[in-house]
A protein has these predicted regions:
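Conserved alpha-helical scaffold segments that buttress catalytic/binding sites
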Residues: 2-375
Length: 375
């Protein structure tokens, strides 16, 4: 490889075939390989790699890309969202046997996963010695000068990978499968650099994620929205929906940080009115497209409890589907994500099946809102 790799060469270093972002030695490998073979329509590991490389080659002409970020290092005391991307893709293939063909028709390209070293979060938290050691482990065949510039942590890899994606296709819509909600940060950060129009973020979430830092950590699941709002200059383009688990009242956040919030009780009382008020707010600000960052815990825990911090008295799935559709019809959708789906967390026997199934419903609606066509 040349000292200065092309964007596609670098993406091939940073990413892995879909499902391959999890570092698996033996346990779980068979399930991972089955997913890859179904998604790429092949029968061997060598063919999987060829399918992955071919997908990268289609980025420039894609309308939307799918990226998995299987990291939950930015979460709290209950983990498991690192398994979200694989579970969501697997369920999607179960529901839509012809998904690979349909995706190709619609211009959806699955570019795979960020490779997630399971002990790391962001490169700015690491010593130079640690970065050097991990670079050598991840990129052993890359020349020293090129290797020294490569990121090693999930958030840092994702941010660089998305910068490269936008170099190849500045208007492509990113659709990201998390991962804890810290994994939305590299997406919105890269979008902020790539797009110069007035886009906004709509964030269904039980929590505000508006701490400036948490225990001294700048970017994690509880802080990413604060820093997103700073990128916007606190101008009201961050809209939060379904808030209900907060140390402070609505006025604290809206007056202090100039975010717009629709708390869960208001959404439950007047769902249609909330949707229209939300859209009206965005239109008045001149927003020309939204990134829909969908934390599954924004949904009531009766429907979505396989997650790190499930909360009752939340949003109903039909409300969120109606919101996604209305945003697609009005201001438009430039991308989105599904965050905090944690398949191992089963408070009830059917927790995983129900939560992952709902995540796939939201994912399909998000694609439809972006592409103006059903998936």
């Amino acid at each position: 490889m040349a000292t200065t790799p092309t964007p596609l060469d670098e993406l091939a270093l940073l990413l892995r075939p879909a499902g391959g972002g999890l570092y698996l030695v033996s346990t779980g490998r068979a399930e991972q390989e089955r997913l890859q073979q179904r998604l790429y329509g092949v029968e061997s590991a060598a063919e999987v790699d060829a399918g992955f490389r071919a997908a990268l080659g289609r980025i420039a002409s894609a309308k939307a890309i799918v990226l998995g970020i299987p990291s939950d290092v930015g979460a709290g005391f209950r983990r498991g969202a690192n398994l979200g991307p694989q579970a969501i893709r697997t369920r999607l293939l179960e529901e839509l046997a012809d998904y690979p063909e349909r995706a190709q028709e619609l211009g959806i390209v699955d570019i795979g996963d960020v490779f997630a070293v399971p002990q790391l979060l962001s490169d700015d938290m690491l010593s130079e010695a640690q970065k050097t050691a991990t670079r050598l482990a991840l990129y052993p065949s890359v020349p020293d000068d090129a290797r020294a510039r490569l990121p090693v942590s999930p958030l840092s890899i994702a941010e660089r990978a998305l910068d490269l994606v936008f170099q190849l296709n500045p208007r492509v819509a990113p659709v990201v499968l998390g991962g804890d909600h810290s994994t939305a940060w590299p997406v919105v950060s890269a979008l902020h650099r790539a797009r110069k129009d007035r886009w906004g973020v709509v964030q269904p979430d039980a929590h505000t994620d508006l701490l400036e830092d948490r225990l001294g950590i700048r970017i994690c699941f509880a802080t990413w929205s604060f820093h997103m709002n700073e990128l916007f200059g606190r101008d009201g383009r961050l809209v939060q929906v379904g808030t209900r688990a907060s140390r402070h009242d609505r006025g604290h956040w809206e007056n202090g940080l100039n975010v717009r919030q629709f708390w869960a009780d208001e959404c439950r009382r007047d769902p249609a009115g909330v949707i229209e008020r939300l859209v009206d707010h965005l239109v008045k600000l001149g927003v020309t497209g939204v990134y829909f960052s969908n934390d599954i815990d924004g949904t009531d825990s009766a429907w979505a409890d396989a997650t790190g911090t499930p909360e009752p008295e939340g949003l109903e799935p039909d409300f969120l589907v109606a919101l996604i559709r209305r945003l697609g019809e009005t201001v438009g959708m430039i991308g989105g994500d599904i965050m905090e789906v944690a398949p191992p967390l089963r408070d009830r026997p059917d927790s995983t099946e129900r939560t992952v199934g709902l995540a796939v419903r939201y994912l399909r609606e998000t694609f439809s809102a972006i592409l103006k066509q059903p998936l």
